[in-house]
Structure formats: C-alpha cells, structure tokens
C-alpha cells in the first residue's frame, strides 16, 4: 500500500515532470488559459496558486524564487534579433522575462484581495485517440 503518496507521476522521469510543469506554468501565466489533461491540470493548479501567492508578496526575494521555480533562462539575443528590436527593447524576444513581469505586475495585483483559489478547471469531452479526460485550466477574472 502506498499511503500519502503525493508525487506527481504521469509515466515520466522526475526531471521531465519538473520541466513539463514549469513550461505549462509559463504558458498558463502568459495566456491565462490552457487546455490539457485532468491529472496535469490538477497538479498545475497547486503550483499556479503558489506562484500567485508569491506574486502577491511582490518582493525581490519572491521574484527570485519565482524565477527559480519557472526555470527562467535569460538567453542572449542573436545580432539579428538585437537589430530588429524596436527602440532597443529586447525584452519582447524573451518570453520568460515577460512571464515573470506579468506574474508580478498583473496577476499579483489582480488577486490582492483574494485569499486563495486563483484558478478554475473546466472539464471537456474526452480525447478521441486515447479517451483521456481533457480540461481547461484558467485564472479567475478577479
């Protein structure tokens, strides 16, 4: 018997799970709504709520913790991308940087009054190929 087993396991290695959740979390913050399977969404909800709680603190330490959890990599631009940057603003080429800024500037301020439960999961029809339960996970409006 495996009592109190809280690990997220969907048939992948732990490093793959960690990277997959970080990428899904970045997509959720960027688009505020993604479609995925139900087990992934339930695990993603736990991490998303923790990130919003960090964003509500809005401190440098919280920002550094969020960068670590999101596995943000600040990549250097190629010379072509640097030339194409309008007005020298190179941040548009690094989505990870935009995600962290959106998390702390928009989402953190949106949920200041709310104590928890920042996301909702809406169930969809099962996927045709493998009958997996699909769902939409999204941030609440306010």
UniProtKB/Swiss-Prot annotation:
Task: Mark the transmembrane ranges.
Answer: none
The protein's matches in PROSITE patterns, at most eight in alphabetical order, are given as: RIBOSOMAL_L17
GO terms under biological process? translation
Entry's Pfam families?
Answer: Ribosomal_L17 (PF01196)
SUPFAM superfamilies according to UniProt: Prokaryotic ribosomal protein L17 (SSF64263)
Entry keyword annotation includes Ribosomal protein: yes
List the keywords (alphabetical).
Answer: Ribonucleoprotein, Ribosomal protein
Keyword Ribonucleoprotein assigned to the entry: answer is yes
Q: Which GO terms describe its molecular function?
A: structural constituent of ribosome
GO CC, alphabetical:
cytosolic large ribosomal subunit
Gene3D superfamilies according to UniProt = Ribosomal protein L17
Q: Would you say which domain of life the source belongs to?
A: Bacteria
Q: How does it assemble?
A: Part of the 50S ribosomal subunit. Contacts protein L32.
Sequence similarity: Belongs to the bacterial ribosomal protein bL17 family.
Record-given protein name: Large ribosomal subunit protein bL17
Provenance organism: Chlamydia pneumoniae
What lineage does the source organism belong to? Bacteria, Pseudomonadati, Chlamydiota, Chlamydiia, Chlamydiales
Q: Which gene encodes it?
A: rplQ
């Amino acid at each position: 018997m495996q009592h109190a087993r809280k690990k997220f396991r969907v048939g992948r290695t732990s490093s793959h799970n960690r990277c997959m959740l970080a990428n899904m979390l970045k997509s959720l913050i960027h688009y505020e709504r993604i479609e995925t399977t139900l087990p992934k969404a339930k695990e993603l909800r736990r991490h998303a709520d923790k990130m919003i709680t960090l964003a509500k603190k809005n401190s440098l330490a919280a920002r550094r913790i969020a960068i670590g959890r999101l596995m943000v990599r600040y990549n250097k631009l190629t010379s072509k991308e640097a030339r194409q940057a309008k007005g020298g603003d190179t941040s548009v080429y690094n989505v990870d940087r935009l995600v962290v800024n959106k998390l702390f500037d928009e989402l953190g301020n949106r949920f200041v009054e709310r104590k928890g439960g920042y996301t909702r999961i809406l169930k969809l029809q099962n996927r045709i190929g493998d009958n997996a339960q699909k769902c939409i996970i999204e941030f609440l409006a306010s």
